[in-house]
């Protein structure tokens, strides 16, 4: 009896750009041998809007509303880097009170970003319950943002030399209440997730990256620290008032998806501690106390000094950038967010180069998914934590 010859052809699957596990308009062309991934080709650019070229045709003040559309889940960091770059270039001083506000707001944004990473990540690997839990705390953070800035997500709050407005009446107390409330909730997530046997089966040993490999690929943020490299720009660059807070860099040695989860959970706790410490020592205290002292002591009292202001001075709409170049970076939730700025004595930047952490971290995806099962792509991509607005710019 003649047997028919068996043919083995690879299967090509297109994942995205509208698949919910892609976390935005990312497309992956995946080549499969049965259930095993043999090749993965990411297709980017669906959300490209020319953000760098837009910056070169706008003043810094005009450009600020645009930057919240990069990483729209952690907008305080994109605003921070946008004002930090011209501040460093022009050597503009920031009052101490404004600097503390510029620590509190991004750390709240970091907590919100990590929470919104955790929920969809768990949903990707089959656990729906945490997705609903995280929105409880995230909504509280957005209420704080709305009270301080008027907007829940696209804040347009940072300014060259400080922030747009001071914290409103009663805001410091509400923020302190949130910190006291949120720490037990993060511990609740850990009890619910970390030792769950099904969760561990899906993430332990999946998508492993070594420390040297992570450095060679230019990874940053939790992706780098989960591979055993103790590198956090808040400690390295000593910007704003982070040196005046007592907190620890979160690091894991394993380099897998579980390690990246552990780093982000640990960072959420540390961010709460940073906010709590900043609220206690912010110059002038709560806004209502500062205003009462100013009214009581008179116009020329020390409570009207530079360090108690929320902005050094409001910049001119035609603020000119000196003819210099500078690279500024901050530790965003996803990694090192940087701006290379070149000025030419005009109100418009000559060059505005963005270093997006999500784009750099995403480079390693094809290597990580090669040889794994198709279902593990969701785990690995979710553990990288990307926002396509930042990746495509």
Swiss-Prot record:
Pfam families: Complex1_49kDa. It catalyses: a plastoquinone + NADH + (n+1) H(+)(in) = a plastoquinol + NAD(+) + n H(+)(out); a plastoquinone + NADPH + (n+1) H(+)(in) = a plastoquinol + NADP(+) + n H(+)(out). Its EC number is 7.1.1.-. Its main location: plastid. InterPro entries: NADH_Q_OxRdtase_suD, NADH_UbQ_OxRdtase_49kDa_CS, NDH1_su_D/H, NiFe-Hase_large. Coiled coil: none annotated. It is found in: Plastid, Chloroplast thylakoid membrane. The keyword Ribonucleoprotein does not apply. PROSITE patterns: COMPLEX1_49K (PS00535). GO terms for molecular function: NAD binding; oxidoreductase activity, acting on NAD(P)H, quinone or similar compound as acceptor; quinone binding. Keywords: Chloroplast, Membrane, NAD, NADP, Plastid, Plastoquinone, Quinone, Thylakoid, Translocase, Transport. The keyword Translocase applies. It is a peripheral membrane protein. GO terms for cellular component: chloroplast thylakoid membrane. GO terms for biological process: photosynthesis, light reaction. NDH shuttles electrons from NAD(P)H:plastoquinone, via FMN and iron-sulfur (Fe-S) centers, to quinones in the photosynthetic chain and possibly in a chloroplast respiratory chain. The immediate electron acceptor for the enzyme in this species is believed to be plastoquinone. Couples the redox reaction to proton translocation, and thus conserves the redox energy in a proton gradient. HAMAP family: NDH1_NuoD. NDH is composed of at least 16 different subunits, 5 of which are encoded in the nucleus. Belongs to the complex I 49 kDa subunit family. This is NAD(P)H-quinone oxidoreductase subunit H, chloroplastic. It comes from Huperzia lucidula (Shining clubmoss).
């Amino acid at each position: 009896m003649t047997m028919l010859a068996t043919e083995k052809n690879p299967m090509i699957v297109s994942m995205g750009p509208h698949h919910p596990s892609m976390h935005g308009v990312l497309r992956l062309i995946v080549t499969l041998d049965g259930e095993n991934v043999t090749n993965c080709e990411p297709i980017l650019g669906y959300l490209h809007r020319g953000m760098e070229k837009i910056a070169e045709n706008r003043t810094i003040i005009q450009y600020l509303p645009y930057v919240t559309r990069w990483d729209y889940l952690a907008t305080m960091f994109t605003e921070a880097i946008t004002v930090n770059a011209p501040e460093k270039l022009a050597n503009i001083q920031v009052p101490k009170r404004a600097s503390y506000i510029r620590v509190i707001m991004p750390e709240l944004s970091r907590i919100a970003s990590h929470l919104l990473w955790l929920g969809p990540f768990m949903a990707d690997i089959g656990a729906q319950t945490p997705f609903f839990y995280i929105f409880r705390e995230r909504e509280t953070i957005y209420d704080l943002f709305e009270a301080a800035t008027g907007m829940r997500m696209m804040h347009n709050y940072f300014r060259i030399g400080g922030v747009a407005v001071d914290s409103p009446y009663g805001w410091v107390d509400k923020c302190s209440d949130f910190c006291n409330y949120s720490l037990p909730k993060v511990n609740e997530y850990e009890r619910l997730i970390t030792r769950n046997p099904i969760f561990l089966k899906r993430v332990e040993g999946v998508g492993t990256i070594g420390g040297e490999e992570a450095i060679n690929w230019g990874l940053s943020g939790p992706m780098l620290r989960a591979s055993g490299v103790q590198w956090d720009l808040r400690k390295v660059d000593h910007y704003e008032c982070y040196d005046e807070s007592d907190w620890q860099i979160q690091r894991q040695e394993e380099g897998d998806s579980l390690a990246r989860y552990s780093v982000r959970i640990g960072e959420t706790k540390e961010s709460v501690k940073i906010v709590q410490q900043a609220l206690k020592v912010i110059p002038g205290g709560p806004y209502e106390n500062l205003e009462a002292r100013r009214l009581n002591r008179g116009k020329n009292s020390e409570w009207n000094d530079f360090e108690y202001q929320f902005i050094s001075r409001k910049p001119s709409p035609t603020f000119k950038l000196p003819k210099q170049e500078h690279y500024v970076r901050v530790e965003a939730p996803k990694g090192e967010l940087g701006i290379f700025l070149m000025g030419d004595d005009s109100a418009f930047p000559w060059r505005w180069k963005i270093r997006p952490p999500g784009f750099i971290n995403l480079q390693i995806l094809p290597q990580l998914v090669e040889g794994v099962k198709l279902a593990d792509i969701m785990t690995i991509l979710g553990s990288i934590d990307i926002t396509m607005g930042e990746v495509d710019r």
